[in-house]
Amino acid sequence: DGGMSAQMNQYFSYFLLHFFRDMDLYQQQQPLKQWKVQPFRPASSFRVGILGMGQLGAKLASHLQSYGFDVAGWSRSKKQLPGVTSYAGANELEPFLSRTDALCCLLPLTPDTLGILNRKNMGQLPKGAVVLNAGRGEHLVADDLLALLDENHLRGAVLDVFKPEPLPADHGLWLHPKVMMTPHSSAQSEHVPCVERIG
């Protein structure tokens, strides 16, 4: 994969640790000059769910276990990965979402996955969950995400892909305080490894 899986692991690890260690809350406290330690929680209580268990998703699932997180994956068919709870198909999407504190989307774009990050599905996540999308911009219904953030159902979102790209300057995602954005840079092809693989 030309080093893309390692980059993707780094990307998701950075942001998942950001939320797990309550860095977003500390950032909110700082301008208010609040000295408040957030309660400790074990890593095993942080339930990560990966939408899309292809090559990148499977490698991410294995990598995240090193932090002690409770990792599950959802895909079209059951996957067998040590230490990862597997969900598959439309009937198991709701139970997968309802147990997920941090949803990581790495799905391919198909007619079945178009708009999968919508109000109905994201609303099945527990209150205070976070959504991270590095799949495709078309997976996300942006207005639904913004509404769930404003209603405080979702704690935050990390977005690397958008529809369209680049995102228009007047889009509501840009300045939302609970949204962190990157310009489709979660994983980039490394020229040398790709050339070596082809040659």
Where does each model-flagged region fall?
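Short beta->alpha connector loops at strand-helix junctions that form conserved
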Residues: 1-3, 135, 184
